[in-house]
């Protein structure tokens, strides 16, 4: 009986120790993302968004919404924030750049978060919500997105020590 309890506790500990299902490669990528930002809130926001949006790079392209890269940045928004003309050639070039250049993808995610940070005066729930829904941040979709980002950041701190 004692053997069963020990095995059960080990299994229970293992199943909760990686509740986000992150691999060693995912952790390397997350540490790289973390190194590209200065503020802790920005570091955790970026890591959580990468997990939520692309499963840390496993889903880099969403052609139905035109979102690309680790952070699923919308191509029209990226072109606008980079002051680049919206043409099919530029969309393709920058979509590929978002998918292949972690630094570029991270810089664009930071630009987007900083834009919403200014709009929402450091209210991170609204910032995360707007990252996903724009000015529809009061929507259920936005709220649930922000809530999931908060939960992921908690798990990154508590379970993974990131």
What are these regions (language model features)?
Residues 4-14:
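Sec-dependent N-terminal signal peptides
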